[in-house]
């Protein structure tokens, strides 16, 4: 893994900083674990935009990831590491003795030829998956389940990790990078280690077109629109919008509370927004 700054042979190349990964597989993904994927471009079943500034982008195929890690006690061998266009982390193709192959999220320290296993008696080693009750305190973990058997939902993006802070009865207490501390049932599974591609946030795309390849469209200011498109739109010449900042639907922005339920979960001990 290395950061490479391109030579300014054109305005679009001048500010590009790439993260180079020579260890990644250069061929096609494993076909039986690939599905076609249709973009909905942030439209709902009525065709209305639910999230602005999405659309276009390069065609992607979805890689089926094993988030449950339910092959108990069977040691698998990592055949290769791969790029996945659907997530910031890298993925690893694991071959099991029965001939089955599965994709998993690749943590730091797992490479071609590494052995990974899932189960209560699995050693504490990057890539292995255990119930939280079998992981020692202070361990760095990722791919954390919220409900037993549902599959990992937390800490899955590049460079992410959490720490097992304590165990209290049937619960384990997890400390997130965001500052949030929460309780999770101790029978839920988690994987050891930190997610790969930790330099993902250091890259620079360099030009607007690189954003478009990823399905991100321009962010247009409300005051630059027409009155039909935004409450701040219209006016002769440049205007300030003429009112307090609002969203396209007229809701006050910049700190206005829209959530009705004040408490998100009784499992959260320390909120990530509290200083």
Swiss-Prot record:
InterPro entries per record: NA-bd_OB-fold, Rib_uL2_dom2, Ribosomal_uL2, Ribosomal_uL2_bac/org-type, Ribosomal_uL2_C, Ribosomal_uL2_CS, Ribosomal_uL2_dom3, Ribosomal_uL2_RNA-bd_dom
In the UniProt record, does the keyword Lyase occur?
no
Give a Gene Ontology cellular component term annotated to this protein: large ribosomal subunit
Q: Offer one Pfam family short name for this entry.
A: Ribosomal_L2
The organism's place on the tree of life at top rank: Bacteria
Basic residues bias (residue ranges): 209-219, 254-263
Q: Does the keyword Aminoacyl-tRNA synthetase apply?
A: no
Keywords in alphabetical order, please.
Answer: Ribonucleoprotein, Ribosomal protein, RNA-binding, rRNA-binding
Which residue ranges does UniProt annotate as crossing the membrane?
none
Drop me one GO molecular function for this one: transferase activity
The record's Gene Ontology biological-process terms are: cytoplasmic translation
Q: Note down the stretches annotated as region Disordered.
A: 208-275
* NCBIfam families tied to this protein: rplB_bact
Q: What does this protein do?
A: One of the primary rRNA binding proteins. Required for association of the 30S and 50S subunits to form the 70S ribosome, for tRNA binding and peptide bond formation. It has been suggested to have peptidyltransferase activity; this is somewhat controversial. Makes several contacts with the 16S rRNA in the 70S ribosome.
Q: How does it assemble?
A: Part of the 50S ribosomal subunit. Forms a bridge to the 30S subunit in the 70S ribosome.
Family (UniProt): Belongs to the universal ribosomal protein uL2 family.
Which HAMAP family does the record associate with it? Ribosomal_uL2_B
Name of this protein: Large ribosomal subunit protein uL2
- The gene name reads rplB
């Amino acid at each position: 893994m290395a950061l490479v700054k391109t030579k300014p042979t054109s305005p679009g190349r001048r500010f590009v900083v790439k993260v180079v990964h020579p260890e990644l597989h250069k061929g096609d993904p494993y076909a039986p674990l690939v599905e076609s994927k249709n973009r909905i471009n942030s439209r709902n079943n009525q065709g209305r935009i639910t999230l602005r500034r999405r659309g276009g982008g390069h065609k992607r195929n979805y890689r089926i990831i094993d988030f449950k890690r339910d092959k108990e006690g069977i040691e698998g061998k990592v055949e290769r590491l791969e790029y996945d266009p659907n997530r910031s982390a890298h993925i690893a193709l694991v071959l099991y003795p029965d001939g089955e192959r599965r994709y998993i999220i690749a943590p730091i320290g797992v490479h071609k030829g590494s052995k990974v296993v899932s189960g209560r008696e699995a050693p504490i080693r990057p890539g292995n998956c255990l119930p939280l009750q079998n992981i020692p305190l202070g361990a760095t973990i990722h791919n954390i389940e919220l409900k037993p058997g549902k599959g990992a939902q937390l800490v899955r993006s590049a460079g992410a990790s959490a720490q097992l802070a304590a165990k209290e009865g049937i619960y384990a207490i997890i400390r997130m990078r965001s500052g949030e501390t929460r309780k999770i049932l101790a029978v839920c599974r988690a994987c050891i280690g930190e997610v790969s591609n930790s330099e993902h946030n250091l890259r620079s795309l360099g030009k607007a077109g690189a954003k478009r390849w990823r399905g991100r469209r321009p962010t247009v200011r409300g005051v630059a629109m027409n009155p039909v498109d935004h409450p701040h739109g219209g006016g002769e010449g440049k205007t300030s919008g003429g009112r307090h900042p609002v969203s396209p639907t007229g809701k006050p922005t910049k700190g206005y509370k829209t959530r009705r339920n004040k408490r998100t979960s009784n499992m959260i001990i320390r909120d990530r927004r509290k200083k």
